[in-house]
Amino acid sequence: MNPELPPNHLDKPVDDAYDHTLGPADAEITLVEYGSYADAPSRSAHERVAELRSRFGNRMRYVFRHRPLAGSKIARRAAELVESHNNSGRFWDLHVALMSRSDKLSADDLCTIISDLKLEGNKEAGQEETAERARDRVEADIASANASGVIVTPTFFINGRRYDGPWDVRSLSEAMLGSLGHVVHAAALDFAKWAPSTGIMLLLATALAVVLSNSALGPDFNEMWEQRLGITFQHSAFELSLRHWINDGLLVIFFLVVGLEIKREFTVGHLAERQSAMLPIAAAIGGMAVPALLYLILVPPGPPMAPGSDGTDGAWSYGWGVPMATDTAFAIALIAMMGKRVPVELRVFLTAAAIVDDIGAIIVVAIFYSGELHIAYLGSAVAIAGLLALLNKGGVYRASPYVILGIVLWVFVYASGIHATLAGIILALFIPTRPPPNLRALMLQADAILTAETRRGREVMHYGPSEPALEALDAIHDRLESPAARMLRHLAPRSSFLVLPVFALANAGVVVETSVFGEHIPLMLGTATALVIGKPLGFITATVTAVRLGFATKPDAYSWRQLGGAGALAGIGFTMSLFIASQAFPEVSDYAAAKIAIFGGSILSAIIGVAILWNAQAEEEKNP
């Protein structure tokens, strides 16, 4: 597969001299189908394609490529049969004959079609060579299908982009005509599926925040985040600044996604097996402990927290949690942009380590960066968590009860003095999982429902499926994935493309002034050094120790140098570091200095990490 192409694009461009095409080469619409002759959906789609060709005429070019059903000998024989008669100009005759069979394709059908088309005597010289050429052509189409992300047959590509919508003529026509809704949806999907997209969104939001903060609009921009919003009821009011609503409210979605990802990794993911989990766990622990210790060594206590303090418990002492964090989105985005220069196994390792890192950051925030505890509200939060546990234990799979209780939980957690975003983690623990369904049984059930509906004739054509049928199909759809998996699938892109960019926009703005430096130089140097040096040092030290002691094994797919490069990328603290800094430094000047240090340390870590990984691969290619 071409690594430069998005995963939902045609890997192999259409070639009229090679491909089987119907329609002019300069047609504005090219519809490519990967299909199988032994597949009822492909035969049904053949009729839809005929309607589309009739509707669009010379505006459309149709291309057929083989993707025989896996494990079906008759499907493979049919595809090779068609290809073996390609040179005699009978491809489309055979194609239409095979696609027009209404019953399940059999060997007798092939004999009948050959007889009907009078192909018995059409035996080219060198039968073995013809058969081999046909096999090679089918194999080439299968390879192209796999590289283009084809999973089912038929799969359509419209002007090079995979079409994932319904197979009815109206839906296909709208996609082919490029309606505004379809174009916007397709562009959004392309961007979202591009691996570096989340990092780019964060980078743009950060750059915008910094530019606006240092422009003539800076005072208004910063004042906007301090606008107070809330609910007033009679003489009572609950108000927070817009920035606090984002940091304490909107960011709950991010922590909910993190919690669901942690849950997945420890149940069916890379952390489910001890042997594969130990290396990233060791790396994450080292990558948290060493930067924190380095910060405490390098950074002085700073000014006292309050008048009358003896200075030993200074304001800067609480910032040791800042360099512990890793921004997974940025780190993975950089690895993805380097393509094949970075082994897939290293990306898996860094992702797993970042998950463990998130657990550590959550624990640190809960214990060290929460306010004064209010026992009554904390007890209420525990009671709500108990209700969530009862729902989980009782097999309640609807999302709405969990969402409602999750909102109530957030209120009590916020009021208790514990950081409110931890409500997202607690909620994630109780969102239920389920064993995988019996797909064959669900498919038969859905087929039975739809077959019964089609017997209603004109009524179903005018009004669609009946309400009982829709409810039954909804139940089948709900069973396809667990509530936890469904919630993660829906919330993860919203967290990446909405929550985190908004958080960066609200928190990354810093006015760069010479006054920020001055007495804050030790704080800034210590924070940046802990990120740039502490992270890779902790990664390497902990992983080498774990491997030497026999607790973990390092895959051969990547070298120690590449692991060090991943450790350097883990020094990109950014969003989580900004979040912890916002809790650790209540003073505006301290927070501004910490933000500059986080930016500088993260940028330097990114440059060092990319350089190490780039040169490590070049060195391996030079000395295989």
From Swiss-Prot:
Question: Which keywords does this chain's UniProt record carry?
Answer: Antiport, Cell inner membrane, Cell membrane, Ion transport, Membrane, Sodium, Sodium transport, Transmembrane, Transmembrane helix, Transport
Instruction: From the UniProt entry, list the residue stretches annotated as the region Unknown.
Output: 1-164
Instruction: List localization entries.
Output: Cell inner membrane
Q: InterPro entries of this UniProt entry?
A: Na/H_antiporter_dom_sf (IPR023171), NhaA (IPR004670), Thioredoxin-like_fold (IPR012336), Thioredoxin-like_sf (IPR036249)
Topology in membrane: Multi-pass membrane protein
Source domain of life: Bacteria
Q: Which Gene3D superfamilies match?
A: Glutaredoxin, Na+/H+ antiporter like domain
**One Pfam annotation, family name?**
Thioredoxin_4
One MF term in the entry's GO annotations:
sodium:proton antiporter activity
Annotated GO CC locations: plasma membrane
Spans through the membrane:
199-219, 240-260, 279-299, 319-339, 348-368, 371-391, 407-427, 497-517, 521-541, 565-585, 596-616
What the protein does comes down to: Na(+)/H(+) antiporter that extrudes sodium in exchange for external protons.
- Return the HAMAP family for the record: NhaA (MF_01844)
What's the protein called, per UniProt? Na(+)/H(+) antiporter NhaA
